[in-house]
Amino acid sequence: MKISLIISTYNRPEALRLSLMSAKVQTRIPDEVIIADDGSKENTRELIKNFAKDFPCPILHAWQEDKGFRLAESRNNALRMAHGDYIVFIDGDIIMERHFIADHERLAEKGYFVIGSR
């Protein structure tokens, strides 16, 4: 199963850095990470570019112009870029437990949509 991890963000590069660090050490690395960016400034773009240099899977940056809070639209933009059979959405301030992606893969069932909260 090919897994796409979509991480939403907006001008919180330090939180995104921690989230990406947790993605990098997963026991099951996602096949791609897509950053759903709702118009962050250049420092977020630089952070993503630096992480992409030695990340264990491709990192894509789905940026949209900042026109106010448009989280759903930014997630949809990222979803259009995804190649995974299974999509995991998280917010950019989530630090994943190291088995987070592996647990999703193990528990995935065709035809189901699962949502959770903190």
Residue ranges, per PLM feature:
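N-proximal low-complexity "stem/linker" segments adjacent to membrane-targeting elements
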Residues: 1-25
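Amphipathic, non-transmembrane alpha-helical secondary structure
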Residues: 17-24, 76, 80, 102
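Acidic donor-binding segment of Leloir-type glycosyltransferases
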Residues: 20-63
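Catalytic metal- and UDP-sugar-binding loop of GT-A-like glycosyltransferases, i.e.
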Residues: 64, 90
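Glycine-rich, basic loop-to-helix element that forms the pyrophosphate-binding segment
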Residues: 65-82, 99
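Short aromatic/hydrophobic "clamp" motif used to bind/position activated sugar donors
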Residues: 87
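Acidic metal-phosphate-binding loop of nucleotide-sugar-dependent transferases
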Residues: 93-95
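Conserved donor NDP-sugar-binding/catalytic core segment of glycosyltransferases
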Residues: 99-118
